[in-house]
Amino acid sequence: MTSRYRSSEAHQGLASFSPRRRTVVKAAAATAVLAGPLAAALPARATTGTPAFLHGVASGDPLPDGVLLWTRVTPTADATPGSGLGPDTEVGWTVATDKAFTNVVAKGSTTATAASDHTVKADIRGLAPATDHWFRFSAGGTDSPAGRARTAPAADAAVAGLRFGVVSCANWEAGYFAAYRHLAARGDLDAWLHLGDYIYEYGAGEYGTRGTSVRSHAPAHEILTLADYRVRHGRYKTDPDLQALHAAAPVVAIWDDHEIANDTWSGGAENHTEGVEGAWAARQAAAKQAYFEWMPVRPAIAGTTYRRLRFGKLADLSLLDLRSFRAQQVSLGDGDVDDPDRTLTGRAQLDWLKAGLKSSDTTWRLVGNSVMIAPFAIGSLSAELLKPLAKLLGLPQEGLAVNTDQWDGYTDDRRELLAHLRSNAIRNTVFLTGDIHMAWANDVPVNAGTYPLSASAATEFVVTSVTSDNLDDLVKVPEGTVSALASPVIRAANRHVHWVDTDRHGYGVLDITAERAQMDYYVLSDRTQAGATASWSRSYRTRSGTQRVERTYDPE
């Protein structure tokens, strides 16, 4: 089924694991076929004096009248990412309403320099809303591959439907990015959401697949400096499937922790040793600088990814930064998860989110959310027993959280947000989440201990990883083995969880109409194979006004 806003032209076409492993997953237990007009071959390597576009093109953060365009030019052979080499280079950009570029609607130029790693960003305005646009760059007589970007509907437009690809957690060494290839081939996406862990910071062989690496990182060591982060971003953007998806539709991206270091918090990270690995402030600044250089992201506030986009009267999308302002994570079973002085969002961001959700006049309020907000607890007791016992023993008030890196570790922020939704009768809030390397469909209860007899304030769709290890990979058993055992146990202890798949890799497609928001979950045949196939797994939806998830059998 094609998007209701897709033009006919566009339609063509658990054991002890290393401390450097993701907290969630351990606690809970390229040959490619490119699509249609986006099948441009990778350009040849730059030769001296001949600019080349080796890292593809991208667009992001669509507005009704504009979109942010991105590329990197390689002006000379020695001007590799992170090298600091290469001359200033004039780069032109052209935007048209047809892929033959006969109807040009915008053009201009800028200068790419070594100071920005020869990356180029052009924030184009004055475009028509809800319209496919084609764009390309040029330098020294060389044209880049063409990309397609769709502008958002006008703010007051009555929109019949929207469709977004949804992905997270793509570890280069763990496999190939076939999920991106399959999303690119659809040709019906208004945009795609990357919910974090676009890159990983580990050194070669530290975080692969079942103890091996399918392909090697660059640089080979753990990334610490600005040059390191630039090299790693550059390696990722040589992937043909990632290039194809970036050329197919605008990305709306937020970071999680691995864009910087595992389990990042405001003053450090689990995967950072102060002094030995330099100063945290310098490392964080380097990682963020490289991210904004290499990603088509338009920050509303410098140094953070929280911002808001609108898609007509149908939906708005609040995008969160859950790393820059958070308190340090506490250990499993620590009652400090309930400490009101500890924050995940930071005061300013939480107030911004609450105000935006309250003032929204759209049918759906989407929240791009890097870590799971629905409670995920073990050892559940009845509410009348849990609260006094937790108070007596200094345990978490909402049960023993499996992962204190997510909202479970910052329950005061969550309680405040959910109470705000309930007290203001804010309906149709849908959290879109990554991070945990599993697929989930959740209600978001106000009180998990009394659910489902008590209210649900929102719903949540969690997508699995593109390639990063999930439970079956960590315990090295056949895919599906762990999920068959773990899923019933998880659901029994967490009655707001409608479904969880702990084992498979893939992606989601979110389809929205005025009546419902539906996530279709797709899984890959084998992440270690560049030509991996994709198949539909399940679909869940939330109907308008219900604040609850239900299964459906009709993928869009």
UniProtKB/Swiss-Prot annotation:
Name the Pfam families for this protein: PhoD, PhoD_N
Q: What is the effect of changing residue 435 to A?
A: Little effect on metal content, visible absorption spectrum and on activity
Family annotation (InterPro entries) = Metallo-depent_PP-like (IPR029052), PhoD-like_MPP (IPR018946), PhoD-like_sf (IPR038607), PhoD_N (IPR032093), Phospholipid_Metab_Enz (IPR052900), TAT_signal (IPR006311)
Q: Where in the cell is it found?
A: Secreted
Q: Does the keyword Coiled coil apply?
A: no
Stated family:
Belongs to the PhoD family.
Give the organism, scientific name: Streptomyces chromofuscus
- Chief location of this protein within or outside the cell: secreted
Q: Domain notes, please?
A: The N-terminal region contains the catalytic domain and the C-terminal region contains regulatory elements.
Catalytic activity line of the entry: a 1,2-diacyl-sn-glycero-3-phosphocholine + H2O = a 1,2-diacyl-sn-glycero-3-phosphate + choline + H(+)
Q: Any idea which UniProt keywords this protein has? A: Allosteric enzyme, Hydrolase, Lipid degradation, Lipid metabolism, Secreted, Signal
Query: Under the cellular component aspect of Gene Ontology, which terms does the record hold?
Result: extracellular region
> What's the name of the protein?
Phospholipase D
**Cofactor note as given:** Binds 1 iron ion. Iron is essential for catalysis. Binds metal ions, iron, manganese or zinc. The ion could be involved in the binding of substrate and/or the release of the product.
The subunit structure is: Full-length phospholipase D is a monomer in solution. Proteolytically cleaved PLD is a heterodimer composed of one phospholipase D catalytic chain and one phospholipase D regulatory chain.
Known role: Catalyzes the hydrolysis of the ester bond between the phosphatidic acid and alcohol moieties of phospholipids. Can catalyze a transphosphatidylation reaction in the presence of high concentrations of primary alcohols. Also has phosphatase activity toward p-nitrophenyl phosphate.
User: What PTMs does it carry?
Assistant: In late stationary phase, is proteolytically cleaved to a more active form where the two parts of the molecule (phospholipase D catalytic chain and phospholipase D regulatory chain) are still tightly associated.
Q: Which residues form the signal peptide?
A: 1-46
